[in-house]
Amino acid sequence: MYNMMETELKPPGPQQTSGGGGGGGGNSTAAAAGGNQKNSPDRVKRPMNAFMVWSRGQRRKMAQENPKMHNSEISKRLGAEWKLLSETEKRPFIDEAKRLRALHMKEHPDYKYRPRRKTKTLMKKDKYTLPGGLLAPGGNSMASGVGVGAGLGAGVNQRMDSYAHMNGWSNGSYSMMQDQLGYPQHPGLNAHGAAQMQPMHRYDVSALQYNSMTSSQTYMNGSPTYSMSYSQQGTPGMALGSMGSVVKSEASSSPPVVTSSSHSRAPCQAGDLRDMISMYLPGAEVPEPAAPSRLHMSQHYQSGPVPGTAINGTLPLSHM
């Protein structure tokens, strides 16, 4: 029986050494294995174990029966079948593996199995970093997509900033004043057209500008000056009544409002400490002199932007 096994197993032996184990791999794998052997002639293969001896013929049969089955699936099925075999069925293949090992030791007495641990660890790292490796091209595409999205977002932000400047929703009061001064002074637009195009935007600009200024003044002085913004919000209604002259006078008078508000801060500096303390007290303990200061500031800003004149007796900047 063993002689029959030897005669059956010996002819495929040279095929494996020459073909490089191309039992179910096909001509391409055999050619690649042959090329690898030519590239590394000093490389000596390990002797086959009992499972390899048994699975060599079984793999060929299964590959012929199922040509579309993948080699990994064939290996899984062969491993399951090998576990189901009894010891008596495995014995001839075990003895054949022992004989091949003894023959290998005679042919290569100095052979020592050196596992390629570096490649195995690299393979393990590749397995663990496989999602990263798969995501690496995707990551580049994501990075490029982020770059494109950042570029698009920058373009959108620029567009929104320009739209915000058109509507008066800018970040600083200086830019708001520049926008205010820039609209009626545009050479291609007359005052009437500017007033028709920008009445509501000018309303928003003045509200934002004076609200931003009064918030800082309220924190410093401790007196509520919200009436100032309300009185200034009434000026665009006057601008709607007389289109051209009021728009120019409002634009020219809006920068001096800042200076006048800074001048109007001087009388309140004597009671700054008291006003700051009263600002943090409850509503019932707020002293009554806050109302005159509120009335004073409201009267001051209501009397400011009169059409045709400017604040503090200065001439309007209509010639600009």
From Swiss-Prot:
UniProt DNA-binding residue ranges: 44-112
GO biological process terms on file: endodermal cell fate specification; eye development; inner ear development; negative regulation of canonical Wnt signaling pathway; negative regulation of cell cycle G1/S phase transition; negative regulation of neuron differentiation; negative regulation of transcription by RNA polymerase II; neuron differentiation
Post-translational modification: Sumoylation inhibits DNA binding and negatively regulates the FGF4 transactivation.
Keyword Phosphoprotein: yes
Residues with N6-methyllysine modification: K45, K120
Phosphoserine modifications at: S254
Protein name as annotated: Transcription factor SOX-2
Organism whose genome encodes this protein: Ovis aries
